Design a protein with these regions (language model features):
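Hydrophobic alpha-helical transmembrane segments
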Residues: 224-239, 259-272, 297-300, 361-369, ...
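N-terminal membrane topogenic signal
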Residues: 1-8, 319
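Soluble extramembrane regions of membrane proteins in the secretory/endomembrane system
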Residues: 26-276
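Cytosolic-side membrane-insertion boundary helix
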Residues: 267-318
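Alpha-helical transmembrane segments of integral membrane proteins, especially early/N-terminal helices
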Residues: 247-254, 315-320, 377-387
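Hydrophobic alpha-helical transmembrane segments in integral membrane proteins
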Residues: 18-32, 517-523
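Hydrophobic membrane-insertion alpha-helices, especially the h-region
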Residues: 5-19
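Alpha-helical transmembrane segments of integral membrane proteins
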Residues: 322-523
Length: 523
């Protein structure tokens, strides 16, 4: 069995390395693009409608004034960054548009925290203004022809900005709509929503489209108003996608491109069909498949590095689910009063960490009262292998940094991750203590059941009003990531039964995830 596992992990490693190398090469190829910082400390990537030159650095000389392309600003959603929209940016650049994708304040590599006045609709105005003004002064684009595209929170910001700047040609709002309060009517607006978007979001987009069109209701796929006069409005549903996957959809890119072509009067009748492929997605999928197998391999290796623990009796595992549920329910009562981890200054993230930290503290105290304390000496021995496991998971997920989200934390976020890991450790110690018992299959089933319970608790917290509603949009992604970590946990347990290593690795892993995803708030 050991030889078979080593062979399987070796093949998976070769697949992961090969696919990651191909992914990196394809990231460097495709449309010419460059990363830099614009006014206000806003990180940005500019994509131009010409192929990248291998080995070249920087941008080439700008084109003559009459040959400069129209430009687009891309604004991402909450708990995201510009990398998530890089596929859409590349597809538009491949078809004649210059695209400036930015990290909004508090997100990604943008070190500006989100302000206390984020309840105002214009709280992202400065970042979008910096992007638009950069394009208006850039010698690489036609600064007189600019459109905005936003996803989710970015759609809110794009629509609001368009009511405060009358010099734009169009707006595309993807899975996002809000009340318009600025002095101007946004020009030529396309609303796109996913078939699996929350009903409330779809209703808001439909209502706003109808309001702009001056009618009681709008039909899907019908254009109202006049493009030439800037009054056009269109609403379209993108089938087969959800709030996140809509930005990767070829159908979305096709609809956006058609709208931009109409806004900027681009005639493609004599051209070949638009190239809407993102050649990075295939190697990314292969790398993630190899990484899935390697998660078990990393866990198995970390388990081998740690000292083995005795297999605990199988009985009591099901009762552990009830104990876990009770701890989470009591923690929600605490959150209804205040957020203990607010000092982390992570928007939404401090609430999630607080939920787990309070539940973990309560469960550990209950365990001590029942004469079942955590073995401190064994925990100390588990810190090294657990940290190694967290680092291994981090490296396996590096392909996400190309097509999904920046994975390397900034200095500020690294400090937050350390603090969050300390707060999360009690919960995962308690989680593993009450659930990880019996043989491998039983322990894995209980582990998966516990993770489903945790996701259900997050949903319940939203329903009860103690967790921000935006978490509902993140639940599908969190559920997948939780289940992926169970693959690592099963590898550790198969090698050593050391549930302490699993707890250390998972607290570190979730702390890193929360620290890189959640927006930094002004302290």
């Amino acid at each position: 069995v050991r030889r078979v596992l080593l062979l399987l992990f070796g093949v998976a490693l070769l697949v992961w390395v090969g696919a990651t190398v191909v992914l990196a090469r394809r990231e460097r190829s495709g449309p010419l693009h460059a990363e830099f910082e614009i006014a206000g400390g806003v990180p940005a990537t500019l994509y131009l409608p010409e192929p990248a030159v291998p080995g070249a650095s920087g941008l080439p000389p700008p084109p003559p004034r009459g040959e400069r392309p129209p430009a687009v600003v891309l604004a991402h959603g909450f708990a995201s960054d510009h990398i998530l929209l890089s596929g859409l940016a590349r597809r538009l650049a491949q078809n004649g548009y210059a695209v400036l994708a930015i990290d909004l304040r508090g997100h990604g590599a943008n070190r500006n925290p989100i302000p206390d006045g984020r309840g105002r609709p214009d709280w992202l105005f400065q970042d979008l203004s910096a992007a638009v003004e950069y394009l208006r002064g850039s010698p690489y684009v036609d600064g007189s022809r600019i459109a905005l595209i936003g996803h989710s929170m970015g759609a809110f910001a794009a629509l609001d900005f368009a009511t405060r700047d009358s010099g734009l040609d169009g707006v595309v709002a993807i899975s996002g709509a809000q009340t318009l309060v600025g002095p101007y009517r946004p020009a030529n607006v396309l609303f796109l929503f996913a078939s699996a978007d929350p009903p409330g979001l779809q209703e808001r987009a439909t209502a706003l489209a109808a309001d702009l069109a001056g009618t009681d209701r709008v039909e899907d796929g019908k254009t109202y108003g006049d493009l030439a006069h800037g009054t056009a409005v269109r609403l379209e549903e993108v089938p087969g996608v959800n709030h996140l996957t809509i930005v990767f959809s070829t159908s979305t890119a096709s609809r956006v491109l058609r709208w931009l072509d109409a806004v900027f009067r681009v005639d493609r009748a004599s051209e070949a069909p638009p190239d809407l492929t993102d050649r990075r997605l295939a190697p990314f999928a292969v790398a993630m498949l190899g990484g899935l197998v390697l998660l078990a391999g990393v866990g198995w290796t970390c388990g081998g590095l740690s000292h083995g623990l005795e297999e605990r009796p199988a009985r009591g595992g099901a009762a552990g689910l009830l104990i876990l549920a009770a701890g989470l329910l009591l923690a929600m009562a605490v959150l209804a009063v205040g957020v203990p981890a607010a000092f982390l200054s992570l928007e939404v993230g401090d609430v999630v960490v607080s939920l787990f930290a309070v539940a973990g503290g309560l469960l550990l105290c209950a365990g001590s009262l029942r004469a079942r304390p955590i073995p401190v000496r064994e925990l100390g021995l588990a810190l090294g292998p657990g940290a190694a496991g967290a680092v291994g998971v981090y490296f396996l997920l590096t392909p996400l940094g190309v097509v999904g989200h920046r994975t390397a934390p900034t200095a500020e976020r690294l400090l937050v991750a350390v603090g969050a890991a300390v707060l999360l450790l009690p919960f995962f110690l308690a989680f593993e203590a009450v659930l990880r018992r019996g043989g491998l299959v039983r322990a894995t089933v209980l582990g998966v059941s516990g993770r489903i319970l945790v996701v259900a608790a997050l949903v319940g917290g939203v329903r009860l009003g103690v967790i921000p509603p935006v978490v509902m949009l993140m639940v599908p992604t969190l559920a997948v990531l939780f289940l992926l970590f169970e693959v690592f946990a099963s590898g550790v347990y198969a090698a050593s039964r050391n549930w302490l290593v699993i707890a250390v690795a998972e607290s570190s892993w979730l702390a890193w995830l929360v620290a890189i995803l959640m927006p930094l708030r002004a302290g």
